[in-house]
Amino acid sequence: LGRINNDPLFGTTQADLFLQFKPPFYPYYYGNQGDTLVGIDSVVLALKYSGSWGDTTVAQQLEVSRIVDREFSDSSFKYHNINYSPMLGLPVSSIENIDIRTLGNKVYFAHGKDSSTNQIRIHLDPIYANEWYLYDSSQTGNYNAFRSDSLFRKLINGLAVKSVGSGNALMYLVLDDPGTRLEIHLRKRYNGRMDTSYVSLGIQTVTYSDLFQSAVANHVQRNRAGTPSVNPGPDELYLQTSPGSYVNLHFPALHPDSISNRVIN
């Protein structure tokens, strides 16, 4: 995830992330049975960070949008063009400036009750957060997303995290880590007592019963126009990705049958 705007050899790189967060069960409810939901304070998108490549002194600018593409779902039988990215709706966050150098610092949240490190945290719009107050598990209605997996995907089919504006590095994320989640911070009442807490929706990695695996996609677009890698000279080789990319070097004066294995500098 991220953007490289200034690579003199390989040009620009844009990496966007698309993912579905899902409840751990259906019908879903907030907190514990018997709790009465009073209100939603905020919704936070959290992404587990594991490293980066590039110039981390330039802040990354990230923006979150809704995924409104009904074709965005996990399937072993679905094939997409390499340029595919889901259709998006309106943004549900402001543009967040991420200083990669500070992601290792401890961050406290939930009124100081919890903390995290190596985590990108993006607060989503209050209007979007308020929608989560309306969702329920009723059999009918316009907001019964918590009733079943199919109804959930119909109303909430995922979020896109796009790099916009500045940036000169790529960030590596761990999607199946508990640190990657959608946090819903809420106020609830139990036995007449008010409390604040949060619940998390994660990336579902397996399919069982009535809960289906989450869909995830990573769209990486490179523009090498005008760079040396487009038209390399006869004495030049450019490899942008590793592992998986390699070249064979052939030296006419060095025959493989005439020498043993050697390291040549």
Kindly give the residue locations of the regions a language model identified.
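Secreted, disulfide-rich extracellular signaling modules
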Residues: 1-265
